[in-house]
Amino acid sequence: MMRNWLWLLISVASAAAAEPPPRIELTFTLTRNGSTMAEVTELLQYAAGNYQLTETWKGKGFYALLGSARRQSIGTIENGVLRPREFFDERSGRDTARAWFDWKAQTLTMQYKGTRGVEPLPPNAQDRLSFLFALSLLPGSKSDSVSYSIADGKGLSRHTYKLVGRERIRTPVGEFDTVKAARQGDDRETAEVWLAPQYSYIPIRLLVVDKDGKRMEQLPTRISQ
């Protein structure tokens, strides 16, 4: 019964969550066990049902030796469902990983290190970048959980997330009332995402803790629209 009431409260509070902002840019600090690893910038652009999500990484301190990274996801949002069309992940010193989603033909094409493979499009397919954006649509949907088949250009993994409550959090750019989602069914690590209603439920904090206790956390340092 309490779970049903929790879901009802989240649903009522997020009735307008399905429409992303036309533009929002967030800069994060990524830390590992409290030490700064990188500055991460995420830029979302959305118009007429089409989105483009671009993420860039710049290593800090010792991690600057690892260079930089850039990922991009392009696709559509139809009836509250996010459908990526193209994805790439390019990093210093590595081959670029790519994925193409053909929703009409129901095929997924992935390419890495010169090898390209085609396979049937799995259920609720997302890419490594788009699935976090897709989570922002969950509070406005008819369910409190969702499972994604996530492609990164090299392979597929299955992730299930569930809305677990509301929480007020403190960040370097202020305090926010959030809806919290947690990954389910993974014994290797815990993953939690805090979605900000103030910004159309875009993820504003991420925390991953592996089985050895290593903490990877991402917190915002700048938000602009």
Predicted segments — roles?
Residues 93-136:
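Hydrophobic, well-structured mid-protein blocks that either form specific transmembrane helices
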Residues 9-18:
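Hydrophobic h-region of N-terminal signal peptides that target proteins for export
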Residues 1-2, 50:
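Intrinsically disordered, low-complexity regions enriched in Ser/Pro/Gly/Gln/His and often acidic
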